Amino acid sequence: MKQNRKFFRRLLAVAFWLTVWQAAAMAIGQEVFLVSPVQALRTLVQLLPRADFWQRVGFSSGRILLGFVLGAVVSVVLAVCAARWSAADALLAPVMQLVKATPVASFIILALVWVRGSALSVLISFLMVLPVLYGAVRTGIASADVQLLEMAAVFRLPPGRRLRAVWLPAVLPAFRQGCSVALGICWKSGVAAEVIGLPNGSIGDALYRAKITLSTGELFAWTFVIILLSAGFEKLFLLALDKAVGAVLGEEGTKC
């Protein structure tokens, strides 16, 4: 019953904002400035059967998710090194702060000097994910139970069991939360990189073309696609992560 009530409230909230959008579109009365939600949905339906639509979705999804995976792997390795060696921590701290503080647009323009447009979204997604997950893993490592670590040392638990009994339960909740944030960031930054780099056959290229041709309906339709892809991949990844954690740690791990 509580779940149904929560779903109903969300549905009402969505309906409210769609009504506001529709009213604003009717008040403006010019689709070149603001299309109605009905027109945006109609444009999206027209895009769905086209082969180039799915090619663009595959092109952008593959590169953005590759950047996310690379960022996740490298951030875990660097966070472990920083926790293990103070020299590594001292070296990495200013780099991570610099990456976090630098505007995405600056990275994109600089990266255009180093890489081709087709690889730009991979690099930018990687850079945006890196400090988020690095910080999450560092937080998880710092939260490990000191008493459990002392017990593991006293009983001389092998590294594998120590990892499973102490480190993973401490790190995984923070890592999961970090992934939830990082996935959204990498989609936004990755598509922004495509809009500036304009690789052929990408979602960013489609957004730019819609903008210069004043196809506002197509602009909204592609934006809706990006939102769906970002939310969908986040849900699927977190579900897969929860299942993997459950398989490694047992039932308790699924609650992280």
Residue ranges and their predicted role:
Residues 66-96, 109:
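Transmembrane-helix boundary motif in ABC transporter permease subunits
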Residues 86, 177, 221-256:
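C-terminal transmembrane helix and the adjacent membrane-cytosol boundary/short C-terminal tail
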Residues 178-228:
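Non-cytoplasmic
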Residues 123, 127, 160-193, 221:
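Transmembrane alpha-helices
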Residues 136-175, 207:
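Short cytoplasmic-facing helical segments at TM-TM junctions of multi-pass membrane proteins
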Residues 97-132, 139:
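Generic hydrophobic transmembrane alpha-helix motif, especially the helices
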Residues 4-28:
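N-terminal signal-anchor transmembrane alpha helix
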